[in-house]
C-alpha cells in the first residue's frame, strides 16, 4: 500500500503568448504549491481492473478522471500485469484553478512508480504525464517553477519568500477551455512581469514579488463571473498585500506577510464565501 499527497497549486504569474497550431496556447507562467492536499492510497489488485474510489458526487471515477487516466497509461506503457485500487480523499476544490485533478494524476504516477517498483525518475514521469495533461509535469515535481510551452516545460526556481496564502473559492465552477476561447490576445494590454517575478523570488524579495504578480486570464474570467473581482476587493480591504486569481479561476488567493493579516482576511471572507483556506507555500 502506498500513500501520496497531492498539493494544490497557485499561479504567481500567467501569460498567454499566442495560440499554437496544435490548438493549445503557448504560455509562460510561474507556479508554486500550497499545503492544501488531496490524499491518495494505492493498492495492488489480483485482477487487472483500475478501481478509483472517491466519495464526491461531482468527481467521476472512470476514464474522465485524470488519476484514472494516469493509472491506465502506466499499466499500458510498462506492461503492468495487475490492476490497482486508488482511494482518493478529496479536499482541493474542483474546477477551481488549483490543479486538483492534475495533482491527483501526478500523485498516481508517483504512487504507481513506487507500488510496482518501476524505479522511474521524476523526469521520466513528467515526460510521460505530459501526454494526458499540461499541468501534470509541474505537479509531478511540486516545486516552484517557470513553466513554458503548454506548461509542460519546466525550469525550477527557489521557494518563494515566506508568507501566508488565503484561498477563496466562490460557489461557481469555471471551464478552462471556455476561458481560453473567450481570450482575445489583441485586446491584452497588461504587461505580465514573469522575469521580474522570477528575479524577486530568486532574491527572496517579498515586496518586489507581490508587485510583479499577474494573470492574463483574470479579466476574461471576471467578465464572466464578477464575484471574482468582489473577492479580490474584499481581500485587499481586509489587509491582504495582494490578491490575484489563480489559473483560469475562479479561486482567488491573497498573500499576507503576517499571520494576523491573514486571519483578518479569512474573517472578512466568511460572510461571502464558503470555501476559504489559510495555507502556506510549499515550493
Curated annotation (Swiss-Prot):
Keyword NAD attributed: no
Record-level Gene Ontology MF annotations: 4-(cytidine 5'-diphospho)-2-C-methyl-D-erythritol kinase activity; ATP binding
Catalytic reactions of this protein: 4-CDP-2-C-methyl-D-erythritol + ATP = 4-CDP-2-C-methyl-D-erythritol 2-phosphate + ADP + H(+)
Entry EC no(s): 2.7.1.148
Pathway: Isoprenoid biosynthesis; isopentenyl diphosphate biosynthesis via DXP pathway; isopentenyl diphosphate from 1-deoxy-D-xylulose 5-phosphate: step 3/6
Annotated binding of ATP, by residue: 93-103
Top-level enzyme category: transferase
InterPro entries per record: GHMP_kinase_C_dom, GHMP_kinase_C_sf, GHMP_kinase_N_dom, IspE, Ribosomal_Su5_D2-typ_SF, Ribsml_uS5_D2-typ_fold_subgr
Residues forming the catalytic site: 9, 135
One Gene Ontology biological process: isopentenyl diphosphate biosynthetic process, methylerythritol 4-phosphate pathway
Pfam families for the chain: GHMP_kinases_C, GHMP_kinases_N
Described function: Catalyzes the phosphorylation of the position 2 hydroxy group of 4-diphosphocytidyl-2C-methyl-D-erythritol.
PANTHER family: 4-DIPHOSPHOCYTIDYL-2-C-METHYL-D-ERYTHRITOL KINASE, CHLOROPLASTIC (PTHR43527:SF2)
Family statement drawn from the similarity comment of this UniProt entry: Belongs to the GHMP kinase family. IspE subfamily.
Protein name (database record): 4-diphosphocytidyl-2-C-methyl-D-erythritol kinase
This protein's encoding gene: ispE
Amino acid at each position: 500500500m502506498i500513500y501520496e499527497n497531492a498539493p494544490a497549486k497557485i499561479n504567481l504569474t500567467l501569460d498567454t503568448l499566442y495560440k499554437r497550431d496544435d490548438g493549445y496556447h503557448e504560455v509562460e507562467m510561474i507556479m508554486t504549491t500550497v499545503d492544501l492536499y488531496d490524499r491518495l492510497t494505492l493498492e495492488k489488485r489480483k485482477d487487472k481492473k483500475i478501481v478509483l474510489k472517491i466519495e464526491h458526487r461531482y468527481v467521476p471515477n472512470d476514464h474522465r478522471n485524470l488519476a484514472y487516466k494516469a493509472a491506465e497509461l502506466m499499466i499500458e506503457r510498462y506492461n503492468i500485469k495487475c490492476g490497482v485500487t486508488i482511494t482518493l480523499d478529496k479536499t482541493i476544490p474542483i474546477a477551481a484553478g488549483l490543479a486538483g485533478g492534475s495533482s491527483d494524476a501526478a500523485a498516481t504516477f508517483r504512487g504507481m512508480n513506487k507500488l510496482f517498483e518501476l524505479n522511474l525518475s521524476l523526469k521520466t514521469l513528467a515526460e510521460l504525464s505530459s501526454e494526458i495533461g499540461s499541468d501534470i509535469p509541474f505537479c509531478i515535481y511540486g516545486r516552484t517553477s517557470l513553466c513554458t510551452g503548454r506548461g509542460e516545460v519546466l525550469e525550477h526556481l527557489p521557494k518563494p519568500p515566506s508568507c501566508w496564502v488565503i484561498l477563496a473559492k466562490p460557489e461557481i465552477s469555471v471551464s478552462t477551455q471556455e476561458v481560453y476561447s473567450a481570450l482575445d490576445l489583441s485586446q491584452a494590454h497588461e504587461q505580465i512581469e514573469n522575469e521580474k517575478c522570477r528575479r524577486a523570488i530568486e532574491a527572496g524579495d517579498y515586496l518586489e514579488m507581490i508587485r510583479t504578480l499577474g494573470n492574463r486570464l483574470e479579466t476574461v474570467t471576471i467578465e464572466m463571473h464578477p464575484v471574482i473581482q468582489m473577492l479580490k476587493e474584499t481581500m485587499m480591504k481586509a489587509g491582504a498585500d495582494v490578491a490575484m486569481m489563480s489559473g483560469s479561476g475562479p479561486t482567488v488567493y491573497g498573500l499576507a506577510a503576517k499571520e494576523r493579516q491573514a486571519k483578518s482576511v479569512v474573517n472578512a471572507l466568511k460572510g461571502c464565501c464558503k470555501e476559504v483556506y489559510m495555507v502556506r507555500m510549499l515550493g
